[in-house]
């Protein structure tokens, strides 16, 4: 799909704005890290710029260790919902969240169409 003039213009303007704001943002980051004029770091300033994670969460097991344990358990995911593989519907009659709405509508029409009116039997034409 071709890029519209509007999207190109907006991208260009965002890039110019980034250039304009970059020195100020750099100064904020440096001051938050304590490399600026003051040597102290206030957590309020850091929280404005970045997400603050408590040290307990950082000290927990790394994610790769968790993956190794899951593989050792059998490698199967634990699913809360049961899904019909053919129709992709769960037990409540809903399609998965990742499915496109058009695709869900198409599958529903196909499913409902099968249970519609029966076709008349073919007869001999006299």
Swiss-Prot record:
For the region Disordered, give the residue spans. 1-22, 53-126
- Does the keyword field hold Repressor? no
| Location (main, coarse) | nucleus
Q: Which UniProt keywords apply?
A: Chromosome, Nucleus
Query: According to the UniProt entry, which residue ranges have a biased composition of type Basic residues?
Result: 1-21, 103-126
Query: What protein family does this chain belong to?
Result: Belongs to the learning-associated protein family.
Protein name in the entry:
Protein LLP homolog
Please report the organism this UniProt entry assigns to the protein: Danio rerio (Zebrafish)
Q: What is the lineage of its organism?
A: Eukaryota, Metazoa, Chordata, Craniata, Vertebrata
Primary gene name: llph
């Amino acid at each position: 799909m071709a890029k519209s003039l509007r999207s190109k213009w907006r991208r260009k303007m965002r890039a110019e704005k980034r250039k304009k704001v970059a020195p100020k943002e750099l100064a904020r980051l440096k001051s938050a890290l304590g490399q600026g004029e003051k040597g102290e770091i206030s957590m309020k300033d850091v929280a404005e710029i970045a997400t603050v994670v408590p040290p307990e969460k950082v000290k927990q097991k790394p994610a790769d260790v968790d993956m190794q344990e899951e593989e050792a358990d059998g490698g199967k995911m634990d699913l809360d919902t049961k899904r019909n593989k053919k129709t992709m519907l769960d037990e409540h009659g809903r399609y998965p969240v990742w499915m496109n709405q058009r695709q869900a509508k198409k599958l529903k029409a196909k499913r409902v169409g099968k249970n519609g009116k029966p076709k008349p039997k073919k007869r001999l034409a006299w």
